[in-house]
């Protein structure tokens, strides 16, 4: 039997080839080299308030559900819709044509933690037959915090009596990601650094938030192959906000800045394109986002798409 020995040069070549292959795989993560293609017209705006922000979308069976922040009279400049602060929802048979359904999460009663406004609903997570929807809330005496509501049908929601469950400074824009039996709740913290806490059951969360070293608001996290990709919003939601992309191969390792997310900006989003959600729809990623072109007087929901690379088919 012959024994072959690898020279140092050959070993170096193999190592470099492996590194190159890994980097090529990482590059295929959405938002790194691929460009999102946004439709030229919005797909939705609340018919009652002419205002829709922070969309979160889930498909169950043949129905799509969109939850969003509606009517925020506190918005700087006096804009913010026509009604009372709340989280509304709409449904769709195809993810494109939406029908308004009503209020999902109303503003809290006087003295409650969300009596000023509920906002930024996270995508509902199903556990043991119950959907959990985390969202941010605020009253006049406290900074933004995070609580949740539950539902069995995605239509009628009951607020958790122990809200808020996360209240360590500024806690906004929750996003929940499940990986290997652990729930990661990503959220914006004071200074706009994106951090996360973990939970085994969606109820009890780790006491000390972990920094991702990514900066922004309204974070979204998806796993594409072996790469975790985070999208974070940079700027102000009514004046020039955009998405920045970050990646990591391990959630225990800080995310690396991948540059500005590549997406065409339609006319209705010339002022700001941000705070959205991504779903996997057959062979495409669908990216729902909030958009404005008039300084925040009106927010609408847009949709961008991107074909999935062979890596994740």
Describe the role of every protein-language-model region:
Residues 12-21:
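Hydrophobic h-region of N-terminal signal peptides that target proteins for export
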Residues 1-10:
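Bacterial N-terminal signal peptides that target proteins for export
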Residues 20-313:
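Carbohydrate-active catalytic/glycan-binding domains of CAZyme proteins
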């Amino acid at each position: 039997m012959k024994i072959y020995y690898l020279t140092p040069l050959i070993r170096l070549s193999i190592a470099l080839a492996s590194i190159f292959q890994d980097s090529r795989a990482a590059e295929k993560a959405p938002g790194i080299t691929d460009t999102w293609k946004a439709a030229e017209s919005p797909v939705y705006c609340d018919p009652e308030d002419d205002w829709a922000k922070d969309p979160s979308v889930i498909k169950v069976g043949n129905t799509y559900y969109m939850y969003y922040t509606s009517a925020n009279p506190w918005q700087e400049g006096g804009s913010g819709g026509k009604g009372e602060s709340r989280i509304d929802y709409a449904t769709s048979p195809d993810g494109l044509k939406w029908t308004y359904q009503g209020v999902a999460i109303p503003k809290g009663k006087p003295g409650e933690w969300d009596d000023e406004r509920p906002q930024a609903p996270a995508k509902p997570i199903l556990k043991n037959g119950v959907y959990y929807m985390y969202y941010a809330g605020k009253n006049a005496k406290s900074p933004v915090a995070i609580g949740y509501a539950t539902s069995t049908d995605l239509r009628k929601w009951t607020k958790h009596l122990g809200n808020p469950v996360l209240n360590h400074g500024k806690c906004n824009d929750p996003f929940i990601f499940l990986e290997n039996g652990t729930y990661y709740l990503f959220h914006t913290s004071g200074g706009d650094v994106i951090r996360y806490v973990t939970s085994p059951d969606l109820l009890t969360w780790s006491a000390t938030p972990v920094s991702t070293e990514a900066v922004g608001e309204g974070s979204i996290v998806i796993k594409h192959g072996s790469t975790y990709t985070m999208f974070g919003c940079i700027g102000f939601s009514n004046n020039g906000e955009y998405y920045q992309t970050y990646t990591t191969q391990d959630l225990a390792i800080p995310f690396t800045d991948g540059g500005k997310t590549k997406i065409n900006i339609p006319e209705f989003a010339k002022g700001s394109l941000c705070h959205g959600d991504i779903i996997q729809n057959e062979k495409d990623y669908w990216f729902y986002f909030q958009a404005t072109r008039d300084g925040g007087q009106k927010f609408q929901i847009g949709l961008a798409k991107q074909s999935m690379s062979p890596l994740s088919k």
